[in-house]
């Protein structure tokens, strides 16, 4: 497959994905091109791609530097913006000796907090002068999208300097009321470490530092918050409790007392998100858990009593907090998601089922037993 032919083929696939409101395109050997729409992967051609096809498609969208990195490490992350098509985040890799790629759509229009339907308290969180805000979720849960919406709100509503350090840069933020500096690792800076070390010399008000994967990155995040900046990052976990446990486990036992004190003083919010299929079949809805670092939460973190935080969140809705199960109840009550999907994504199936049975107005018109026979009591 020639480069021009490969480039046209991949662009046609990307256009098709956008027309179907897909989120991800999968290119892999011995399997047809496939795309994910509303969380479900479907083939878009009966003909499987061979190893030569996948190699040609990957090389067609890489520049020389990316191709050299891929040749050396067998991994490469980058973003592309084919003219007239859109912007996409790409992860290229080798599997069983063949090239594979996953290409994710980056929406052309910046998302907004109102447009995403996420809680309004996020507007207050992102306007904080200082502190650490962590967005939590699994891969594909919409963390980056919500984070982009929060950054855009800050960009519109304040005057300052926003720095983002990403690999790759996903959403491109124009300068509005803020100066926005976006640095891509490998393109604008040699490493995360170098970019993070130098960011404090650039007079930032907000630092968005992408995903926290290890202790060193977490230390930078806490240091930024301690020095009077608003630091925002993402973390792979399923809930606020799990995220705190994961952060604690980044550090050796002898450093955890200091870590817990640092988190109790500097954490601003923990925002956990999942995407649930909408009841009408048109896309997915963001269901969000929010933990805010109130004095009571701060005290629990300082003591290491992470398991007790969920109960405080349940009782603090007046402050803007909510658990996943409370958010699922609201989404069910608003006819946004089905009863089955609410239970399927619940932290405690039994608690949510009981809450719906006792407090839901919608439940009176729904057969709550239908389709839920396989759900375990937790």
Residue ranges and their predicted role:
Residues 1-378:
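Short, flexible helix-loop junctions that flank or precede catalytic/ligand sites
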């Amino acid at each position: 497959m020639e480069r021009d032919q490969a480039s046209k083929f991949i662009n046609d696939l990307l256009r098709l994905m956008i027309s179907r409101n897909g989120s991800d395109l999968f290119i892999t050997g011995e399997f047809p091109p496939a795309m994910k729409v509303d969380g479900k992967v479907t083939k878009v051609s009966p003909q499987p791609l061979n190893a030569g096809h996948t190699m040609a498609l990957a090389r067609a969208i890489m520049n020389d530097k990316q191709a050299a990195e891929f040749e050396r490490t067998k991994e490469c992350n980058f973003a592309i913006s084919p003219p007239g098509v859109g912007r996409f985040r790409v992860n290229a890799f080798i599997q069983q000796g063949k090239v594979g790629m996953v290409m994710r759509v980056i929406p052309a229009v910046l998302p907004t907090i109102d447009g995403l339907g996420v809680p309004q308290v996020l507007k207050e969180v992102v306007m904080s002068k200082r502190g650490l805000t962590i967005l939590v979720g699994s891969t594909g849960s919409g963390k980056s999208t919500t984070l982009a919406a929060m950054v855009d709100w800050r960009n519109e509503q304040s005057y300052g300097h926003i720095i983002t350090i990403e690999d790759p840069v996903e959403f491109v933020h124009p300068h509005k009321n803020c100066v926005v500096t976006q640095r891509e690792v490998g393109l604008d800076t040699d490493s995360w470490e170098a970019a993070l070390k130098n960011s404090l010399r650039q007079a930032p008000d907000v630092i968005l530092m992408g995903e926290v994967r290890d202790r060193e990155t977490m230390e930078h995040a806490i240091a930024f918050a301690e020095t009077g900046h608003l630091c925002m990052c993402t973390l792979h976990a399923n809930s606020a409790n799990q995220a705190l446990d994961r952060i604690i486990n980044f550090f050796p036992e002898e450093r955890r007392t200091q870590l817990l004190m640092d988190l109790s003083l500097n954490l601003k919010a923990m925002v956990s998100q999942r995407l649930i299929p909408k009841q009408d079949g048109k896309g997915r809805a963001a269901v969000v858990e929010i933990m805010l670092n109130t004095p009571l939460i701060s005290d629990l973190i300082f003591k290491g009593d992470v398991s007790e935080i969920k109960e405080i969140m349940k009782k603090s809705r007046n402050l803007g907090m909510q658990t996943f199960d409370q958010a699922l109840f609201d989404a069910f009550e608003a006819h946004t998601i089905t009863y089955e999907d609410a239970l399927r994504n619940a932290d405690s199936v039994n608690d949510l089922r009981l809450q719906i049975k006792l407090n839901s107005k919608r439940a009176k018109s729904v057969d709550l037993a239908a389709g839920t026979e396989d759900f375990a009591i937790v």
